[in-house]
Amino acid sequence: MDNGIKYAVFTEKSLRLLGKNQYTFNVESGFTKTEIKHWVELFFGVKVVAVNSHRLPGKGRRIGPILGHTMHYRRMIIILQPGYSIPLLDREKN
């Protein structure tokens, strides 16, 4: 079973949200909020309060005369209950 999460995102906004117990991940665009919520709760052993998402467009690519683009993806902001945290990402707060 593929979990759908590509990687954690570390931008200025996502680092600011870490202080509010909100974690940001890029995920495959075909996964729903409930699937990602269920996977995060199982894998990290945390309680998820809410999941916000938005779809990011793919980037244009050019190889010689051929124009193409990369696939679009979805960014999820996962809000955890107070008292829970994802330990691998907590080091980035300090």
Curated annotation (Swiss-Prot):
GO molecular-function terms, A-Z: rRNA binding; structural constituent of ribosome
Principal subcellular localisation of the protein: plastid
GO biological process assignments: translation
Keyword rRNA-binding annotated: yes
Domain of life: Eukaryota
Cellular component terms per the entry's GO annotation: chloroplast; ribonucleoprotein complex; ribosome
InterPro entries per record: Nucleotide-bd_a/b_plait_sf, Ribosomal_uL23-like, Ribosomal_uL23/eL15/eS24_sf
Annotated Pfam families: Ribosomal_L23 (PF00276)
Keywords from the named record: Chloroplast, Plastid, Ribonucleoprotein, Ribosomal protein, RNA-binding, rRNA-binding
Compartment(s): Plastid, Chloroplast
Similarity comment: Belongs to the universal ribosomal protein uL23 family.
Stated role: Binds to 23S rRNA.
Subunit structure of this chain's protein: Part of the 50S ribosomal subunit.
Protein name (database record): Large ribosomal subunit protein uL23cz
Organism the protein comes from: Agrostis stolonifera
